Regions:
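Lipid interaction determinants
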Residues: 1-69, 79-266
């Protein structure tokens, strides 16, 4: 399986109309590890309406603008019915910004249907965060091509905290970073705080959520990176390093106090 860069174009809570209140991107590695970041557009949500949704001068967005962040693994199976063949995807949440216990959440599954314009229609059922009620939904996704011009096509790093000598959690943080082509997304969370980031090479054209609102481009000039989204302690995430060189599986990378481990490299 190849890695995928998926951009959501719309979501529809049945029977309502389709809309897209977020800038949603999912980076999925060839082995199915993913980081899914959904940021409310400026003007969406209570925080943005009352002014709390604007970024500060450093380019950081407030967590009022975070709709959802997820990291985990995905698998797909083929389901055949008398009428059609369906690709059913299952998403295992290892990290989830909406809950401290993602393992206890109901299965996250969606059925995928190809559309004539090359996009994908996903159908499923999940809790509508606006109502708190399980609701049928439809999402439309567009996949971008994965550029091959970067140092390494895909690298995935994971941080899983550590325990003391008698098995007590000393650091409860968990994190995942996926770099795919010229894009990268990272998500790290503990019980008390979290950080979410999205980066891309400077010659890509997508607008920066932070740069457009803060009056600066929020660029990391040294690495020619553009930070599209930054929330919380993004210095915990290996954003510059994943673009700087090639990595091997099992390699360890120190980022501040955190020792990340490479779990996938292509």
């Amino acid at each position: 399986m190849a890695g995928t860069i998926s951009i959501r174009k719309s979501i529809r809570w049945i029977p309502g109309p389709a809309c897209e209140p977020t800038r949603t991107m999912v980076l999925t590695s060839p082995q199915g590890r993913f980081v899914d970041v959904r940021v409310l557009k400026k003007g969406e949500g209570d925080g943005a309406v009352d002014g709390a949704g604007a970024s500060d001068r450093s380019g950081h967005l407030p967590f009022a603008r975070l709709d959802w962040a997820i990291a985990g693994t995905s698998t797909s199976t083929i389901v055949r019915t008398p009428d059609e063949t369906i690709r059913r995807c299952r998403f295992e949440h290892w990290l989830d910004s909406r809950t401290a216990t993602p393992d206890a959440m109901p299965p996250d599954e969606g059925d995928m249907f190809p559309l004539a314009d090359g996009m994908t229609l996903e159908k499923g059922r999940m809790v509508n965060p606006d109502t708190g009620v399980d609701t049928d939904y439809e999402e439309v996704w567009r996949d971008e091509s994965v550029e091959r011009g970067t140092e390494q096509e895909c690298v995935v790093l994971r941080y899983d905290g550590y325990e003391d000598e008698i098995g007590h959690d000393v650091d409860e943080r968990r994190g995942m970073m996926v770099k795919l082509g010229g894009h990268a997304q990272g998500f790290i969370k503990s019980r008390g705080e979290m950080a979410v980031g999205r980066w891309k090479m400077a010659d890509h054209e997508e607008e920066s959520e932070a740069g457009n609102e803060a009056g600066n481009e929020a660029e990391d000039d040294k690495q020619r990176l553009r930070c599209v989204v930054r929330m919380g302690r993004v210095d915990w995430l290996p954003s510059e390093q994943v673009f700087a060189r090639r990595f091997s599986i099992g390699e360890q990378l120190q980022v501040g106090p955190l020792l990340w481990v490479v779990v996938e490299a292509v």
